[in-house]
Amino acid sequence: MDLQDRVTDLESRLAFQDDTIETLNDILVTQQRAVERLQLQMTALLKRQEEMGGQFETSEEEAPPPHY
């Protein structure tokens, strides 16, 4: 393999690697946006759960149900 063939091969590999890096970067950006949306949803759900938490708690002072 002469020098020109080696250079051509390296240029081809470099172009392929550049394309792969760009594709991976696009995927990473998409996943990061999805993670950020999920974090916002989780925060909203936790806040909602805290707000609703007092509605379903039973008091220890309540009398037992009639079938006791």
From Swiss-Prot:
Q: Which Pfam families match?
A: SlyX
Top-level taxonomic group: Bacteria
Could you tell me which InterPro entries the record lists for this protein?
A: SlyX
Give the family, as the similarity comment puts it: Belongs to the SlyX family.
Q: What is this protein called?
A: Protein SlyX homolog
Q: Which organism was this protein described from?
A: Pseudomonas fluorescens (strain SBW25)
